[in-house]
Amino acid sequence: MADPVVRWRDDGTPFSPRFGDVYRSAGPAGALAQARQVFLHGCGLLPTPGQEAIWRGAPRWQVLEAGFGLGLNFLTTWHAWRQAAERPRQLFYTAVEAVPPEPDDLRRNAAAFPELAPLAESLIAPWHGLLPGVHRLRLDGGQVQLTLAIGDVQPMLAELTGEYDSIFLEGFEPACNPQMWRLHTLRAVARLARRGARLATRCVAHEVRERLVACGFEVEGTTAAGSPPALRARYAPRWTPRPRRSGDEAPMVAQPARCAVVGAGPEVLWLERAS
């Protein structure tokens, strides 16, 4: 019998048998605070004393996450967008995930965060039939669009087009998931970043920092002792990136090649769902 995507430990920690690492810490309060501190504050999406959130007044905002996991960063971002003053009219969130969790795992994880639980139920409603490939879930009346790229991180990133304003790198630790942190993967991330885009990650490994710099990111610092491990960077290449597709629309995937389907019958697989 195959291992489950998520194995729950006795202390409530969700664990990945495939990668041999935990999705988050055992304490719900700490996990939520870490998501906000590392990723939302790290990318300037929450206001601070004397500083507005950087997405305030923007017509749209595009977030790219490598490592969707159990959706905590997505739900936290969605919640922050809902609470934001002069929020962007549209939030596009694109996430790559090797193996999507089951709806029950999403629900069990979100149950630890009461303010996120209603959003999690809206996410779970269209969460079915997530075969390898790209799926778009329309949420909050279409104002929030979640694009899920299901598959290994590097080839999935290669399928995406567009320019992203915020980037979350949330894969498991390099020792557990080395593909996530290889140079060619980070180059694929850089290809999708607009100039000035902010990046945040919990990974502070020296070799990852060096690879980000090689890809055109300026590392702005890591958190001080006593704070959650985190790294912040800004995409500021010294070279001129190749022209790319405008970011005025929802993130897209590369145009597929033609194919023939034999014996499909009347069934049609819809990759875009609305809640």
Question: Where is each model-derived feature located?
Answer:
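Class I S-adenosyl-L-methionine
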Residues: A205-A257
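A short glycine-rich, Lys/Arg-flanked "PGG" loop and its adjoining helix->strand segment in the class I
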Residues: M180-R195
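S-adenosyl-L-methionine
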Residues: R107-L160
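Glycine-rich SAM-binding Motif I of class I
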Residues: L70-L75, G265, L269
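N-terminal Rossmann-like FAD-binding beta1-loop-alpha1 element of flavoenzymes
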Residues: A257-S275
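Class I SAM-dependent methyltransferase core
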Residues: V63-E65, G69, A95, V261
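Conserved beta-strand signature within the Rossmann-like core of class I S-adenosyl-L-methionine
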Residues: S166-F168, R195-C203
